[in-house]
Amino acid sequence: MTSLTNAVFKRYLAVTPSAHQALKTRIKKKSSSFDKFFPQQSNSRKKQWETLNEDKASWFKRKYAHVHAREQDRAADPYGKKKAHVEKLKEIKNQAKLNQKSHKSKFQNKDIALKLMNDNPIFEYVYGTNSVYAALLNPSRNCHSRLLYHGTIPSKFLQIVDELKVTTELVDKHRLNLLTNYGVHNNIALETKPLQPVEIAYLGDMDTSSAALSIHELGFNNENIPHELPYGTKTDAKKFPLGLYLDEITDPHNIGAIIRSAYFLGVDFIVMSRRNCSPLTPVVSKTSSGALELLPIFYVDKPLEFFTKSQEMGGWTFITSHLANATSEKYTVGKTISMHDLNGLCNELPVVLVVGNESQGVRTNLKMRSDFFVEIPFGGIEKGNRAPEPIVDSLNVSVATALLIDNILTCK
């Protein structure tokens, strides 16, 4: 028995300590297998924020607050592509600012020019070679302040500028653009007072032997002041004067084109309704190519009285242009004449041609006081060459006026 016990003891000693530990654990687990049915306390390690009784988000913010923003950017953009893109956008933005600044520097004289315009509210700036030259020759322009030019002054201006003692000033082209509102100024502009047309009451009779007609200016106390106005004559074509009355033409370019055609074809004077026509601005002067300065132009404030008194006192005949759809109106019955009937009319009596705007024509109250009406036929309708289209149903008022003037002054 003793020998058997010794043998078991020796075998036990031969087992490794790890085996002894496993054996003890196994025996322990066997002995406590019943305890597994009871709640056991967890042996897992607590988190750091739980140990400190702190919120997880707050703990992370506090723990990593020392990490530099550069390290965060490096982690978000490890290859530097985002940084390069941001720098490129910044460079483009800076270049755009430089370009804008450079562009604005070209207009640094804008304030000077605007100040110049504000300092001279009683002046206007006539521009264009012919318009400026005609304005210098016009005695009605009694005050010329300065002649502004870019480059060189045309040779034909030198003598008249010296005679009138007009100050000349060399300016840059942009300043001329501002003063003329970007019109075609031909590098020259004249600072001068606006035209002040005479207001008249009516047209009087005329003396064909001396080729002069009388006009009656309206004075301050509504008194009529008579004046003589010479008119041009042509052999076998024009014995009596021809005037032009403009009603409700508001486009300055149309006014200028009409004045140019009237002067070229031989009209003696123009009368305008002050209240509803475009004023005689530098745009009108430029469009007329200087004819505004050469042709007598008058204003009337009472057109109906002007028509009536001119017919009674001077024997003037008023011929009104009218639209194609106006032939059925009562006041045109028996008064409509053709274009051919206008030929040589100024050999028989003094005539005032009345024209209106392109949309409505002459006002009805003026039509009712007119002696005759004339219409320009559309594209040879009578011959059947062309049918009228609603898109193009009329001529420009300046073209229509030129055709009517030419027919009146042509003797066939």
UniProtKB/Swiss-Prot annotation:
GO BP annotations, alphabetical order: rRNA modification
What are the entry keywords? Methyltransferase, Mitochondrion, rRNA processing, S-adenosyl-L-methionine, Transferase, Transit peptide
Instruction: Look up the signal peptide feature and give its range.
Output: none
The chemistry this enzyme catalyses reads:
guanosine(2270) in 21S rRNA + S-adenosyl-L-methionine = 2'-O-methylguanosine(2270) in 21S rRNA + S-adenosyl-L-homocysteine + H(+)
Subcellular localization, per the record?
Mitochondrion
Q: What is its main location?
A: mitochondrion
Is Secreted one of the keywords?
Answer: no
Q: Which Gene3D superfamilies match?
A: 3.30.1330.30, 3.40.1280.10
Q: Which SMART domains match?
A: SpoU_sub_bind
Q: What else is known?
A: Present with 2760 molecules/cell in log phase SD medium.
Checking NCBIfam families in the record gives: rRNA_methyl_3
**Described purpose of this protein according to its UniProt entry:** S-adenosyl-L-methionine-dependent 2'-O-ribose methyltransferase that catalyzes the formation of 2'-O-methylguanosine at position 2270 (Gm2270) in the 21S mitochondrial large subunit ribosomal RNA (mtLSU rRNA), a universally conserved modification in the peptidyl transferase domain of the mtLSU rRNA. This modification seems to be important for the normal accumulation of the mitochondrial large ribosomal subunit.
Tell me what this protein is called.
rRNA methyltransferase 1, mitochondrial
The species this protein belongs to is Saccharomyces cerevisiae (strain ATCC 204508 / S288c) (Baker's yeast)
